[in-house]
From Swiss-Prot:
Domain annotation Cyclin N-terminal: ranges: 79-148
Protein name: Putative cyclin-H
GO annotation, biological process: regulation of transcription by RNA polymerase II; transcription initiation at RNA polymerase II promoter
Keyword Kinase found: no
SUPFAM superfamilies, per the entry: Cyclin-like
Species for this entry: Dictyostelium discoideum (Social amoeba)
Length: 286
């Protein structure tokens, strides 16, 4: 399935106002539950901003745990985005962020086929296996079972590979720093990780986020865009020329066919006339 047909673009893209509205709705719904159950006139209730601050804290902890366990970016990125999506439909006052974080990271490991032993994971994170797994169904239902996440790491890797393959163009340009694949990748990766702690994943497509991070970290970005634009224009011109050539060939073939048909028709008419003349001559002889 392509990104344009994915559940991410269909169900998980919002603007600022939409995100704010969803978070306020979740907060208000659980606030009413607390007020009904708490006799105190002034119960401790978190505001939407308070909840967002706590969620942000546990998103950063997710990355720390993933790095401690040597989990790849393809696991940590979906885990963080699962947490974000979960708390668009649920309040942190209803489901504690620590266990949600641990469950989301464990789900991401399974989704990305990166095996993680539950007992080992439980021992490292100081949470019981049942605490980690009990929330799985609740989280999956809140995510609508939309587990495939398109994150900026993949397009970024592709961009840097393309830059590296054409490094001779950029390395010989004044004002552009020499390209070292590993250095540029690690620098851009840190920017992507920071973007995961914001709402970028809800508001922008992953390839756009990747380009923005590349622009922040590489002074040859503008030249890269111009070069790609020129290549695209050349490809379009070549395609147009090929189409024109094909059209000309088709027209020539059609003209040749029409000429052949006309010649055949003329020959047939001549043959018919000759036959008629012969018949007339025969009639005269009779």
């Amino acid at each position: 399935m392509s990104y344009n047909e994915s559940s991410q673009i269909k169900y998980w893209m919002f603007n600022n106002e939409g995100l704010k509205k969803l978070r306020e709705q979740c907060n208000n719904q659980h606030k009413q539950v607390i007020l009904e159950k708490t006799p105190s006139s002034e119960p401790n209730i978190l505001s939407p901003d308070d909840e967002l601050s706590l969620i942000h804290y546990y998103e950063t902890k997710t990355l720390e745990i993933a790095m401690a366990l040597n989990l790849p970016d393809k696991v940590s990125a979906p885990a963080i985005i699962y947490i974000k999506r979960f708390y668009l439909k649920n309040s942190i006052m209803q489901y504690g962020a620590k266990l949600v974080m641990l469950s989301c990271l464990f789900i991401a490991c399974k989704t990305e086929d990166n095996h993680l032993d539950i007992d080992y994971y439980s021992n490292i994170t100081k949470a019981s296996p049942s605490d980690i797994t009990n929330l799985e169904i609740i989280i999956l239902e809140s995510l609508n079972f939309n587990l495939i996440v398109y994150h900026p790491f993949r397009p970024m890797y592709g961009y840097i590979l393309d830059i590296n393959d054409n490094s001779a163009i950029y390395n010989n340009t004044n004002g552009v720093s020499p390209i070292k694949f590993d250095t540029l990748w690690e620098t851009c990766k840190k920017s992507i990780q920071k973007s995961l702690f914001s709402d970028c994943c809800f508001e922008f497509h992953p390839q756009i986020i990747a380009l923005a991070c590349l622009n922040l970290n590489w002074d040859g970005f503008n030249m890269y865009c111009i070069n790609n634009n020129n290549n695209n224009n050349n490809n379009n011109n070549n395609n147009n020329n090929n189409n024109n050539n094909n059209n000309n060939n088709n027209n020539n073939n059609n003209n040749n066919n029409n000429n052949n048909n006309n010649n055949n028709n003329n020959n047939n008419n001549n043959n018919n006339n000759n036959n008629n003349n012969n018949n007339n001559n025969n009639n005269l002889l009779l």
